[in-house]
Amino acid sequence: DYFGPVTVAAVYVSSEKIQLLKELGIKDSKMLTDEKMLLIADNIKAACPHSILVLRNEKYNAVQQKGWSQGKIKALLHNKALLHVLNKISPTVPEYILIDQFAERDVYYRHIQNEKEIVRDNVLFSTKAEQLHIAVAAASILARVAFLKEMDNISNEMNMEIPKGASKKVDEIAAKILLTNGENVLKTI
């Protein structure tokens, strides 16, 4: 997406909650509409310890100018979200932590090597992890809903519908904002 923040979520699903989440319709977010995700997100939040992090564009652009890649940004956010959830569920220790893989394991850990606390124990990485475990599906739904809500906020602030994704329409809206409001405003959305 050209507009909007980077959102990351982590969810702890105990074995007792798996069936409940299935009954709520939690599954791979690519198989759900935005409307359905908006309806079930609060149920996930009520049922499971979670963390949702939103990195708005202004901050995203600032750290990118420092030379941080999108992979590094996502790794830092994932590590922080996992730490939040582990603190919430302590002293419980999850059997394993599954990360929907966006970078190879060694690259992920290289990105976060300078952090004070790094989640390493029982961490697994897999592509298409949403299809493997309901906790990843739940986290993806929470991250998507946080993104959608932030996009609504941006649209309200700009007094126009800000499109999602990347397309000719997105380019046209970006050009309109640049001409009307300037580069500094464009960088914040």
Report residues per predicted region.
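RNase H-like, Mg2+-dependent phosphodiesterase core
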Residues: 1-189
